[in-house]
Amino acid sequence: MPAIMTMLADHAARQLLDFSQKLDINLLDNVVNCLYHGEGAQQRMAQEVLTHLKEHPDAWTRVDTILEFSQNMNTKYYGLQILENVIKTRWKILPRNQCEGIKKYVVGLIIKTSSDPTCVEKEKVYIGKLNMILVQILKQEWPKHWPTFISDIVGASRTSESLCQNNMVILKLLSEEVFDFSSGQITQVKSKHLKDSMCNEFSQIFQLCQFVMENSQNAPLVHATLETLLRFLNWIPLGYIFETKLISTLIYKFLNVPMFRNVSLKCLTEIAGVSVSQYEEQFVTLFTLTMMQLKQMLPLNTNIRLAYSNGKDDEQNFIQNLSLFLCTFLKEHDQLIEKRLNLRETLMEALHYMLLVSEVEETEIFKICLEYWNHLAAELYRESPFSTSASPLLSGSQHFDVPPRRQLYLPMLFKVRLLMVSRMAKPEEVLVVENDQGEVVREFMKDTDSINLYKNMRETLVYLTHLDYVDTERIMTEKLHNQVNGTEWSWKNLNTLCWAIGSISGAMHEEDEKRFLVTVIKDLLGLCEQKRGKDNKAIIASNIMYIVGQYPRFLRAHWKFLKTVVNKLFEFMHETHDGVQDMACDTFIKIAQKCRRHFVQVQVGEVMPFIDEILNNINTIICDLQPQQVHTFYEAVGYMIGAQTDQTVQEHLIEKYMLLPNQVWDSIIQQATKNVDILKDPETVKQLGSILKTNVRACKAVGHPFVIQLGRIYLDMLNVYKCLSENISAAIQANGEMVTKQPLIRSMRTVKRETLKLISGWVSRSNDPQMVAENFVPPLLDAVLIDYQRNVPAAREPEVLSTMAIIVNKLGGHITAEIPQIFDAVFECTLNMINKDFEEYPEHRTNFFLLLQAVNSHCFPAFLAIPPTQFKLVLDSIIWAFKHTMRNVADTGLQILFTLLQNVAQEEAAAQSFYQTYFCDILQHIFSVVTDTSHTAGLTMHASILAYMFNLVEEGKISTSLNPGNPVNNQIFLQEYVANLLKSAFPHLQDAQVKLFVTGLFSLNQDIPAFKEHLRDFLVQIKEFAGEDTSDLFLEEREIALRQADEEKHKRQMSVPGIFNPHEIPEEMCD
């Protein structure tokens, strides 16, 4: 069967690609059908045939036949793809008469298809694609080869309403292509010319839009015109907006017509966002007229929340657009309206609408409103941060030190506070949630959207609290009271209230905070006793834990309360409801970090530090926790121990702290000494992994002083490492590499990994590099390096590489002497694992380059000490890195290269031979990634490296000849070398283009943003064949701009004494 398929495909391909005979349209339709409706091999064959045909340089000559005779819409779309391809890439090399022919054909086809209203509706997608083709032609032809385009399209629009409607779409697409999407699609100079042409000829387009809006009764045409106008508003000269009847037409004629209200409101929003001072009156008019219309369309007493939930799509869109309009206008022009006393009421009405819209149960709309409330609260606070925040309404007498703007917004801010408290989003720390089925469960996936919403709401509520903390407290206390008495009790209400209470930590005066919090925690603890049922208790517990975790200042100041809270957390650690134990451990660690010192001091009324109580009862506290929760608990206690400053006391605490894990560890080591096979027992290996994880977390918290515990287990741990390595190797030899997937082998590898994590974690926190280098590094290298080298690739631990990287980063010069030994063991064998492709061993890949980066940054002399063959491998691997498809690896590769180049420049002895051997090579490889579209993300770094390299040559830092065979001035050589390199890679470029590009590489090498845009322009040019006519590349203009840039650079340099060699200074300046 596959053989027959191949024959058929070959036959189809031969027939379709034979341009000497007529196109068999039925055959083409069949192949296209195969692509869309076939499966497997059949589909792949069709894809191959169509790709071959599309890439054929003469394929475009078949497009008219395809569009005219094909019965299949997909085939027509395929024909348009061919046409688009030729316009974008080969237009400049087509003879003029053929360009004119294609242009006439496309215009004719659009006129024919769009003149018939029924056809327009039926073939919407097809016409849309034809329009896009025309716009691609315009980007090549207009204004030079088609100066009359704007008057042509405006003239044609007056002949037929249906045609006019489609022409509006074409103008809208052209505007988008030139003003919104031009970056990276057309060169900067060409983009500027197209923008200038659009602005210069806009009056004709504007008159057409005005004519339609004033005279047409054709609703779809008017709608299309408004949509097009919307796209123009962000770039047209402002006179067209503010010195014509446009604003009043939009408001009076279209805003209250259901079909046009959404697009009209979007237009008004776009205008509202303009920031200029000379049109103040027009903005006031815009605001007052829009508000008048709004009150007719949507009376102020409307329940917008209800209207939204019952509304149709376009009604819901209208409410969203309304929020955008109000938010945009008020953020930009609120002070303009505030100044006018006669508009105060209108301003309050606008804020009332904002409040009503803020209550709509739709997150996207709420985010828009929140943006405004945040802006307003922040502005009012920043104007006078230290004004009293007591509420004048509550304190009975008028406070004259409340700033006037604040007074104006006061009544509204009461309502906004209530809104924020009632709608507070879920913070990241809360793990116990109610799911869609109404069950209380542990949340596993973090919702970044919800976290961002929480952060913005938190910030807004903090500002609102600063503006009037009495009111904030009143709202929260009342709402809490209603939870306790049951009138507002629900999980959702309790959650949002507690999340809001937690979010204002630090925004009240300390005394007020204390009074408020004591009430809150007492009420919540009471609620916990009062409510029955595990779910209720879990929700209340999660809220108590969240709030206490947010108020470390309060806890630090009130020891009794802190102790009560921590004991309550220990209670929750026995509560097996989903998520409660996790949250108890997470809250405990937060409190431990923020209040660490209080646990190691003897507090008033206590006989010993609380840490001793914890360590005495540690067994009882953690007996119901899961292993990973125990690890979190150990980390928390570690922060407390880390705060003890008396070394002797601290060492005693560490011994007591690690007693439980050490007992199990010692027992396993003793058994292993008698019978090493115990290290093949699954349960034992699992225990070892868990003990080491505990040590890792403890070390992370205690820091350098953990050395006393590390030293105690260090050599045994490395022996276990070696022993497990041998077990793994033996298993692989006996059963092949698949054995690494088995649970026991995976547990053994966990032990190895955790060993490396413990060592690297401690080294990164240590403070005595010499002691580490002398006592800890030698046994480590002995245990891990040879093992890594000997292992089969699948069994090599990527952590070995990251551990070495951490050691190099931390110890710097202290470890330089060991680098050759480390490299011998890990460099080549890892490189052979990752240089076959870009996918396998992703962790080894990342860590390998992190190690290279560490050596490059901290032990660069070691690079110069390794043999030349190995250094070449290092450089090859850096080049391999920046060509990577994995973004993080490519970025690391570029950073290593840049640092390497800068380091080499400091090494006089090695620099010149390095440049002679590698400079041109590196340049060539950098250009290969610059011109590779899959690497555009790295363009800034490419620009920095290239600019640095060209600058080295220009400033004469490279004294050796880059071309020993024919020694000429390096700058002249480099200009020719790069020009030839680019010409051979892109033979379709004209000499003038290449010459100008190379000139820019020298002129702009001290202005990275300009250098980067210069590269981006070049990337646009290599996509298309330029032909003889390069006028629309505006090379002369670009040349003048580059010359100016060069002169500017020269002037800047002249102003720095000594920057130029005395022989480079012009004669008249020598005197």
From Swiss-Prot:
Residues 327-450 are annotated as: Interaction with Ran and nuclear export complex formation. Cellular target of leptomycin B (LMB), a XPO1/CRM1 nuclear export inhibitor. Changing residue 411 to T: Strongly abolishes interaction with Rex and RANBP3, abolishes Rex-mediated mRNA export. Does not abolish interaction with RANBP3. Abolishes Rex multimerization. One of its GO terms (molecular function) is RNA binding. The modification Phosphothreonine is found at residue 448. Belongs to the exportin family. HEAT repeats lie at residues 217-240, 241-277, 354-472, 515-553, 560-597, 602-639, 775-813, 885-916, 917-954, 1002-1039. This is Exportin-1. Expressed in heart, brain, placenta, lung, liver, skeletal muscle, pancreas, spleen, thymus, prostate, testis, ovary, small intestine, colon and peripheral blood leukocytes. Not expressed in the kidney. The modification Phosphoserine is found at residues 391, 450, 1031. Residues 411-414 are annotated as: Necessary for HTLV-1 Rex multimerization. Residues 800-820 are annotated as: Interaction with HIV-1 Rev. Changing residue 561 to A: Abolishes Ran binding activity and nuclear export complex formation. Abolishes Ran binding activity and nuclear export complex formation. Does not abolish Ran binding activity and partially abolish nuclear export complex formation. One of its GO terms (cellular component) is nucleolus. The keyword Transmembrane helix does not apply. The modification N6-acetyllysine is found at residues 446, 693. Changing residue 553 to A: Enhances Ran binding activity and does not abolish nuclear export complex formation. Abolishes Ran binding activity and nuclear export complex formation. Changing residue 550 to A: Enhances Ran binding activity and does not abolish nuclear export complex formation. It is found in: Cytoplasm; Nucleus, Nucleoplasm; Nucleus, Cajal body; Nucleus, Nucleolus. Changing residue 334 to G: Does not abolish Rex-mediated mRNA export. One of its GO terms (biological process) is response to xenobiotic stimulus. Residues 46-112 form the Importin N-terminal domain.
